[in-house]
């Protein structure tokens, strides 16, 4: 099948709805380069000014494949987005649909004028259900929808595609208003709701409520697409609950020109997504229905209570928090720690039994953790990520700085035959050294020479590598985690002696 969309013959009939995966230009470029089935790439919604959005948690699962979210329109602002989107290499058979929002008609116009030159089309977010004063608040008023659409059309020369809310008694009336304003196409639907989820007596989302998406909204999405097309005859991007080839066929049967797949991607790696979209396209081509078997309906987003038993201060801005039980997290995986009313952040577990983690004071959440009282009940969800699997005959070299030791300690502990390199500015910022020495050959460096080698940990690493034979170096696998400059410096040294495929890194932000 071929998909024609505003003068382009698309490489595929799918899009990923705004705000789900394609939230950064690096990811957008990856989709352009590796996922041809996604013919329309939709950006996250962009406003006039930078916006932080809501504190985590921003996503909750209330049933397998069914979610509520309240991200809160997080974005870097229009001017920064112009620079970022302008760097993209958009293939001739793809369509870059830039989603925009505003708090007024005038803001929509200003954002549209800025972003149109770096876009193939503009999606007007008139349907976000969880950001007060934006989106749905405007999209439920036909006159406002008509006026905003007309005002944007008057200042740009690319297609304008309003995204409609299902949270209205008559979506056909809203669709007709958009068409009267000059809309070139429509997108239906955005999330339902807002809805509410709770865990252990607390609202999960920091916003309290959020838009509902996933399998549960499919029947409403299909109904809305049919009503919108019947009312306007415009091309429609159909979104809401599609996860299988049967769902996609239902959207096409309803009249959709392009189909959005979003919630079905939750929990997938980029490689998983490539395989999923490839299978979904093959299903359509050969009247099969296998792609849904790749959807992660097994994702566990439940929170488990843990109680703080120790808060050990390492120095002014580093602490080790130890909790009262074991959690099942393997080397290379991470968890989310949630404290109701404060927020949620991802952490590598320093140890799994008992569960402990390392905190560095970088923001409101971690600042509060520094003095978290013993006895505090918190909640953990996960693990997430992919466990590491070094080759059986590998010699592990773990390089850590800051709180990065938490990401690599379990690798050395669980697989053995390891060196651990730990770097810090000074001795008072070092921690967990005795435990490291019990499981690996330990190498310590401090910038001021107050402990171990006097200098950068990468200098110590280079010395160790230079004293090894080619055969020994060929068996090495490196795991780096720490501040970005340290990680990049470690990678540079490692590439002097070993192949890039032997190196695995994570930046500790």
Question: Where are the predicted features?
Answer:
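N-terminal capping/small domains of soluble enzymes
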Residues: 1-96, 102-103, 276
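Catalytic cores of alpha/beta
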Residues: 25-33, 106-117, 168-181, 225, ...
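Glycine-rich phosphate-binding active-site loops on the catalytic face of alpha/beta enzymes
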Residues: 43-48, 125-132, 185-195, 241-275, ...
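Glycine-rich beta-to-alpha transition loops that act as phosphate-gripper elements at the mouths
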Residues: 99-103, 164-170, 234-246, 508-509
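FNR/FR-type flavoprotein reductase catalytic core
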Residues: 364-508
């Amino acid at each position: 099948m071929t998909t024609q969309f505003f003068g382009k013959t698309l490489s595929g009939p799918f899009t990923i709805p705004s705000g789900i995966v394609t939230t950064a230009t690096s990811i957008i470029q990856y989709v352009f380069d590796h996922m041809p089935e996604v013919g329309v790439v939709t950006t996250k919604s962009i406003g006039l000014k930078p916006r932080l959005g809501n504190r985590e948690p921003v996503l909750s699962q209330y049933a397998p494949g069914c979610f509520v979210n309240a991200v809160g329109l997080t974005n870097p602002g229009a001017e920064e987005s112009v620079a970022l989107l302008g760097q993209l290499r958009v293939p001739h058979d793809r369509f870059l649909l830039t989603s925009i929002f505003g708090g007024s008609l005038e803001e929509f116009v200003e954002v549209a004028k800025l972003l149109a030159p770096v876009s193939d089309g503009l999606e007007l977010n008139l349907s976000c259900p969880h950001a007060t004063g934006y989106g749905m608040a405007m999209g439920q008023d036909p006159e406002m929808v008509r006026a905003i659409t007309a005002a944007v059309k008057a200042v740009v020369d690319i297609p304008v595609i309003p995204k409609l809310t299902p949270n209205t008694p008559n979506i056909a009336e809203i669709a007709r208003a958009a068409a009267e304003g000059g809309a070139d196409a429509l997108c239906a639907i955005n999330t339902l709701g807002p809805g509410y989820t709770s865990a252990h007596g607390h609202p999960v989302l920091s916003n309290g409520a959020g838009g509902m998406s996933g399998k549960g909204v499919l029947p409403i999405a299909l109904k809305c697409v049919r009503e919108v097309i019947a009312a306007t005859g415009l091309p429609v991007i159909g979104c809401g609950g599609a996860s299988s080839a049967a769902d996609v066929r239902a959207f096409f049967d309803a009249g959709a020109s392009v189909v959005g797949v979003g919630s079905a991607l939750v929990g997938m790696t980029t490689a998983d997504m490539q395989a999923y979209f490839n299978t979904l396209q093959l299903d359509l081509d050969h009247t099969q229905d296998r792609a849904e078997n790749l959807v992660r309906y097994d994702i566990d987003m439940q929170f488990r209570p843990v109680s703080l038993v120790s808060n050990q201060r390492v120095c002014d801005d580093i602490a080790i928090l130890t909790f009262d039980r074991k959690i099942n997290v393997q080397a290379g995986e991470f968890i989310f720690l949630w404290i109701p009313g404060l927020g949620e952040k991802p952490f590598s577990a320093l140890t799994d039994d008992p569960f402990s983690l390392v905190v560095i004071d970088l923001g409101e959440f971690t600042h509060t953790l520094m003095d978290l009282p013993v006895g505090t009940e918190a909640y953990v969800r996960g693990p997430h990520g992919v466990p590491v699997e070094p080759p059986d005959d590998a010699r592990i070299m773990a390089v850590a700085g800051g709180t990065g030791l938490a990401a690599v300690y379990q690798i050395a502990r669980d697989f053995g035959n390891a060196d651990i390199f730990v770097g810090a500015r000074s001795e008072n910022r070092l921690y967990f050294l005795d435990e490291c020495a019990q499981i690996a050959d330990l190498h310590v460096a401090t910038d001021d020479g107050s402990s171990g080698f006097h200098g950068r940990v990468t200098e110590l690493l280079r010395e160790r590598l230079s004293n090894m034979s080619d055969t020994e170096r060929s068996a090495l696998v490196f795991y780096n985690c720490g501040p970005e400059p340290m990680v990049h410096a470690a990678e540079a040294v490692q590439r002097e002696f070993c192949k890039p495929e032997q190196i695995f890194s994570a930046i500790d932000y």
